A protein has these predicted regions:
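Sec-dependent signal peptide recognition
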Residues: 1-8
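N-terminal beta-strand block that forms a small beta-sandwich/beta-barrel module immediately after a flexible targeting
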Residues: 8-38, 225-226, 252-253, 257, ...
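Short beta-strand-turn/beta-hairpin segments enriched in glycine/proline and small hydrophobics
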Residues: 18-34, 138-155, 180-182, 226-230
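Surface-exposed patches in structured soluble domains
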Residues: 22, 40-43, 49-55, 146, ...
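Amphipathic alpha-helical coiled-coil/rod segments that serve as protein-protein coupling scaffolds
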Residues: 51-155, 191
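Short, surface-exposed secondary-structure boundary micro-motifs
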Residues: 55, 60-62, 176, 213, ...
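Structural microfeature recognizing short secondary-structure transition sites
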Residues: 187, 218-262
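Low-complexity, intrinsically disordered
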Residues: 204-221, 249
Length: 262
């Protein structure tokens, strides 16, 4: 009975206690170019909400567009294949006719063999024409992929935190040059640092109430998503994370809060 009361009091103390926490972006992402190029346009500004896959930056791509058009033209050309197919059809008929004439002793074996050789040569030329077109299609695909690198898309649903480069700036950018920074804010991460004595009293999936600082307001009941399995020996603390849905982006990241575990 005494043990039960002790556990009950400990549980009540855990539920009643409040702890400081911080509301942070789920992740921040620096946008860079994978190719060296000059910025043609920046499609968003600081504070803009962006969707995953949305075009946010375009790079100058004149030569790449021309290369793609040329490769597509080669890939779509059917002239060589049609000529080769026609020649295969003609030489096949000649070879078949030569076989019949040879069986009737109207032509020599050499004449029959020449007709067969012409057919085989035409077949090989048709195969080469088809292989050439396949290579042209692969080249067109490669050119399309190279051109796609000139269009930069957002890797996340989020908000633009900072824009570092502008369209038309002198000189090409490289992968070392960040263009902009995005923050993913749905869901937000609520990070709390608890005393080590709370280990075992807060569990994954447990509900908690998060209250942002007064300037923001609101009260949100959300589950614990992570309880660090290792206690920081130097500070005697334990890290806990909760995920706060933020579909409309109404709650900013970087806000202090208080959390109470239920």
């Amino acid at each position: 009975m005494l043990r039960f009361l002790t556990l009950l009091l400990a549980s009540s103390a855990c539920a009643a206690a409040e702890f400081d926490c911080m509301i942070e972006a789920r992740q921040t992402v620096e946008i860079r170019s994978s190719v060296e190029a000059v910025i043609e346009s920046v499609k968003v500004t600081r504070g803009s909400f962006v969707a995953k896959g949305q075009v946010i930056v375009t790079l100058e791509s004149g030569p790449e567009r021309a290369a793609l058009a040329l490769a597509q033209g080669r890939a779509e050309t059917q002239g060589d294949i049609k000529v080769s197919e026609a020649r295969v059809g003609i030489t096949r008929k000649k070879w078949q006719r030569a076989e019949e004439l040879f069986k009737q002793n109207f032509i020599s074996a050499n004449a029959r063999d020449e007709a067969e050789a012409d057919f085989k040569l035409a077949s090989e030329e048709l195969q080469r024409a088809r292989e050439t077109q396949l290579l042209a299609r692969l080249e067109a695909q490669r050119a399309a992929e190279v051109l796609a690198l000139r269009t930069i898309r957002s890797p996340v649903n989020g908000v633009v935190v900072e824009v570092m480069r502008k369209a038309g700036e002198f000189g090409a950018i490289t992968f070392k040059d960040p263009i902009m920074k995005l923050a993913e804010i749905d869901p937000l991460h609520v990070e709390a640092i608890l005393p080590a004595s709370m280990y075992g009293k807060v569990k994954r999936g447990q509900r908690a109430v998060v209250v942002p600082e007064a300037a923001i307001g609101g009260r949100y009941e959300i589950p614990v998503s992570i309880v660090d399995p290792v206690i920081d020996a130097a500070s005697g603390t334990l890290g806990v994370r909760l995920e706060l849905p933020n579909r409309k982006g109404a709650i900013p990241a970087g806000v202090r809060c208080r959390v109470q575990f239920l």
